[in-house]
Amino acid sequence: MAIFSDLSNEFQIIDYSPTHNQILIRSLKSKNRDYNIDIIIKGVLSILIPSIFKGLEISIAEISDKKYLIEDYGFKITKDYRVFSLKDSTGKVYFLNAMCFGVYHNKLDILETSIGRYDMENFGENILWYAD
């Protein structure tokens, strides 16, 4: 079951902060909408994802995928960390090991990041927060 799904827009990695263990995946403003769609992923341990997604759907990974990722790539599953699957519109599936993620709409400039900020309530609208 998808936690987040937007298969009609292009998303790309915009920023990564190893000191904050965060990654920002953004769908930039377009002629069809005047806001970015930012996906801020926190507590990032491992990533096996491309830099650009043609559409994006985020779910919790299947049990069969988790075993392979734990054994081959050192992914961790604890009460805090989970394995997310990221699927593009072509059906290709990628994986990310992290704690949680949030989806925001904002009007930040293309070079302006939304990770590592302390003014989260001021920079955009929180659409979804997943930390279950």
Which residues does each predicted region cover?
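Surface-exposed, interaction-prone regions used to assemble/regulate multi-protein complexes
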Residues: 1-132
